[in-house]
């Protein structure tokens, strides 16, 4: 027997969800965009980036991990939450060394696309200019630590055929970094190495090959702003 749809609202708009769906998944099915950086389709969500934070009954929660409940009233696109998301995006920029004009991922970078969507100009926080390494992680992958946002998408989604994790977190808090096992990274096929690069939302994981192969104007976010594929689906 099919379970009845769950009825809830997002910013006052009546929505329906399938049982077991998260707020993010249900919002997407209803044509409502909730920004996120750490979520990747097919992987278990971690809620680590907090950009998808929404408010329900005065409580803040990650939309990518919180299941929808009957009668839930979700606040999403409201001024204070949007400003908080913008602040988080700014923090990602100032805590790393993101030189967008010279980055191979420019135009395909989700962090850059979010900065454009939220019209980020000058961050409200001082740049930290941390000293970080560029690591030749084996024969197929380059790890650019200056751009890493610790979203853990690579940790969750890049594994060898015998299910060993190629990437893993080291240390905690502001000293946290993503470690790459060079031996396991070298064992990846060309296709697997390319998928590892694609799963990174920024330009931190790069496959060793010719850079800047896709010209300006044909890159992913040159064509349409991030989130538009969800919002246009409902029009």
Give the label of every model feature segment.
Residues 2-11:
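Eukaryote-biased recognition of intrinsically disordered, low-complexity regulatory segments
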């Amino acid at each position: 027997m099919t379970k009845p749809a769950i009825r809830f609202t997002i910013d006052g708009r009546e929505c329906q969800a399938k049982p077991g769906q998260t707020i993010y998944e249900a919002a997407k099915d209803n044509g409502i965009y909730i920004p996120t950086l750490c979520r990747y389709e097919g992987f278990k969500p971690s809620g680590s980036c907090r950009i998808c934070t929404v408010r329900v009954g005065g409580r803040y929660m990650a939309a990518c991990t919180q299941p929808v409940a009957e009668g839930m009233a979700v606040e999403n696109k409201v001024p204070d939450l949007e400003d908080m998301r913008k602040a988080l995006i700014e923090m990602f920029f100032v805590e790393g060394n993101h030189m967008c004009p010279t980055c191979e991922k420019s135009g395909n970078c989700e962090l850059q696309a979010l900065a454009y969507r939220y019209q980020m100009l000058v961050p409200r926080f001082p740049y930290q200019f941390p000293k970080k390494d560029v690591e030749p992680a084996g024969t197929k992958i380059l790890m650019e630590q200056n751009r890493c946002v610790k979203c853990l998408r690579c940790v969750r989604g890049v594994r060898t055929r015998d299910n060993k994790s190629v990437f893993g977190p080291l240390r905690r808090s502001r000293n946290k970094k993503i470690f790459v096992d060079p031996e396991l990274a070298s064992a990846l096929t060309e296709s697997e190495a390319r998928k590892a690069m694609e799963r990174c939302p920024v330009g931190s994981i790069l496959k060793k090959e010719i850079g800047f192969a896709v010209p300006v104007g044909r890159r992913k976010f040159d064509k349409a702003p991030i989130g538009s594929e969800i919002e246009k689906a409902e029009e």
